[in-house]
Amino acid sequence: ISDVIDTNTVKVIMDVNQKALAYSRHPIPFPKSNIAKYDKQLGLYAFKQSGLQVFSENLPASLEKIESVEMYRLLEHGYSIQMVKTNDVSISVDTPSDLEQATALMKQDSLFGKY
């Protein structure tokens, strides 16, 4: 539940084909009932060169400015964003405390020091 109320965690709503419909730093959909389910955006982006060109040529639109979620730049200009569900757990690194936690986890990785 902490991720749901954490404004550093971006939540995403997807359609039945796992295309992004909306992002927010607040709980979406609104939890009017106890059946609300939340998906967290991991924030790992894969672009073709042409996609990067489109992203860089478009200016931030209103929702990107309001939510501080850069993927709104594409959604607001009519582009679709394919999401991929994963069961992997991730942590966000937004604060010095998060960085300490991430560093401690990396040091436990058997490949630490090789990357």
Please place each PLM-identified region on the residue numbering:
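Conserved core of the sugar-phosphate nucleotidyltransferase
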Residues: 1-59
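Conserved alpha/beta core of the MobA/IspD/sugar-nucleotide pyrophosphorylase nucleotidyltransferase superfamily
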Residues: 34-115
